[in-house]
């Protein structure tokens, strides 16, 4: 804890314990536990011997003081406990709390709520055999007696940074976490096991408690409302921007159409779609009339007067595409959005040192092989794997770290499309999307996102704000559709619903 805060770790622990209590009261009438289960029902705290367990002891003490029946079971060797755990255990004993070692406890039938505080945020590898056995017992008893299970800060077995889980990790009903939601609770598989996350205040600015670190922010309606702007009454198509989408090939006509139409639906003043001349007539017959269609063979004229160029949807992977992409990058000096086949054409733009990544040596993880213009890049995991020459399984385990280092080293805005999608900025800030649904897992969704981001850039939003807004509006549109059908809605449906989300953000 930074000394300049003037707040001791003991005080923060006391605040954390009170936060657990408040979270429990927020979900239950703790004075009525006996009515729900039996006359002897209680809240069970399962505490390890470190500071995470000490947080649980503080909470148990406060609940007991309030007249709520509690019991405490201890996991581990108390002779090797942390100093603060020893202090909190002494206080609980002085108050007369019921405390047993875990292997001596057998009153599961009267447990109304169980709160697990075995280890907290410290895990980076496997769980100890003892912890696995305890968690297995908890899961068995929960199945038999149907009590809710809470985690303190993060579930035992969950890596608080990467979201990866160790073998034996349980699925929880709730996690009460302190100061700010832990990154691992937003990333799969951690998000799937953490249950409902409740953030409890620490009583000190959490940014200062955590120190000078790269920032991770959640993308939600509150953030999007701060970014969206009202239009001036005199707005016209020139004010609202001129966007160019480049893409399409003989085999992929739909992708650039989706992107261009999404740019229109997100509010761009003028949208032009550049496609190969051989498919121009077909595209004109299928696209909405608001989009003008030109051909890419005359690309110098095509680029003139654009506020943004988005390139890649359906572009193809023929041998001439890398040179074409390079020619656009050399010719156009304005804002760019690179997606799909434009990313493929770039090849390997960097490399990752697996040993440094495994060891957490952040400064040595990533090496740039190709300089990139300041742009928005929107790869999915497969495309990102090719860009950094690293297998997808490694990316999944180090999702945020790799996104952050890529954006910092290349000085680009990276929209890494996954579950969840993240936006990484050149300054090291990472935004994690908190909305969206499984119905978005269909071809063409990424093309719509590219068009949305380009549409916002054309209207004068910065690249980073356009990326964050684009991710939110795209996902929120899908969530609105999800209210009426869980899946089966199309990327075109998402595109046409974008205006509803923008109206929602503007309070109209």
Task: Give the predicted meaning of each segment.
Residues 112-113, 118-214:
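Internal gly/pro-rich beta-alpha loop/helix module
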């Amino acid at each position: 804890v930074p000394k300049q805060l003037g707040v001791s770790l003991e005080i923060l622990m006391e605040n954390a314990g009170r936060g657990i209590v408040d979270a429990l009261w927020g979900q239950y009438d703790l004075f009525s536990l006996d009515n729900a289960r039996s006359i002897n029902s209680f809240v069970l705290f399962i505490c390890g011997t470190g500071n995470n367990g000490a947080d649980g002891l503080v909470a148990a003490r406060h609940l007991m003081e309030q007249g709520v029946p509690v019991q405490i079971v201890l996991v581990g060797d108390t002779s090797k406990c942390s100093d603060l755990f020893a202090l909190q255990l002494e206080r609980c004993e002085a108050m007369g709390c019921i405390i047993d070692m875990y292997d001596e406890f057998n009153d599961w039938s009267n447990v109304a709520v169980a709160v697990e505080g075995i280890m907290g945020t410290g895990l980076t590898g496997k769980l100890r055999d003892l912890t696995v056995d305890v968690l297995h017992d908890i899961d068995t008893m929960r199945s038999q007696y149907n009590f809710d299970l809470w985690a303190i800060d993060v579930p035992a077995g969950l890596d608080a940074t990467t979201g990866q889980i160790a073998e034996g990790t349980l699925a929880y009903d709730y996690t009460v976490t302190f100061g700010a939601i832990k990154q691992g609770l937003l990333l799969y598989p951690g998000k799937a096991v953490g249950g409902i996350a409740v953030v409890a205040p620490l009583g000190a600015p959490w940014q200062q408690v955590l120190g000078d670190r790269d920032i991770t922010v959640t993308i939600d309606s509150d953030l999007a409302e701060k970014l969206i702007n009202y239009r001036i009454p005199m707005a016209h198509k020139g004010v609202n921007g001129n966007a160019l989408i480049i893409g399409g090939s003989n085999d992929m006509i739909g992708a650039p159409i989706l992107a261009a139409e999404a740019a229109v639906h997100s509010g761009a003043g003028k949208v032009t779609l550049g496609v190969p001349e051989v498919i121009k007539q077909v595209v004109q017959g299928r696209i909405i009339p608001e989009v003008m269609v030109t051909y890419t063979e005359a690309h110098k004229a095509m680029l003139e007067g654009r506020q943004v160029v988005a390139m890649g949807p359906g572009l193809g992977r023929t041998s001439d595409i890398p040179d074409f992409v390079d020619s656009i990058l050399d010719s156009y000096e304005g804002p760019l959005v690179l997606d799909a086949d434009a990313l493929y054409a770039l090849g390997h733009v960097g490399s990752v040192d697996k040993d440094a990544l495994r060891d957490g040596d952040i400064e040595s993880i990533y090496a740039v092989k190709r300089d990139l213009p300041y742009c928005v890049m929107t790869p999915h995991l497969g495309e990102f794997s090719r860009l950094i020459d690293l297998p997808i399984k490694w990316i999944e385990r180090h999702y945020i770290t790799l996104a952050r280092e890529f954006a910092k080293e290349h000085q680009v805005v990276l929209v890494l499309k996954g579950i969840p999608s993240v936006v990484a900025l050149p300054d090291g800030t990472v935004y994690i999307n908190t909305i969206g649904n499984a119905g978005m897992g269909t071809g063409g969704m990424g093309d719509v996102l590219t068009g949305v981001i380009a549409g916002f850039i054309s209207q004068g939003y910065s690249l980073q704000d356009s990326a964050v807004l684009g991710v939110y509006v795209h996902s929120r549109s899908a969530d609105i559709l999800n209210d009426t059908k869980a899946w089966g809605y199309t990327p075109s449906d998402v595109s046409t619903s974008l205006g509803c989300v923008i109206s929602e953000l503007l309070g109209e």
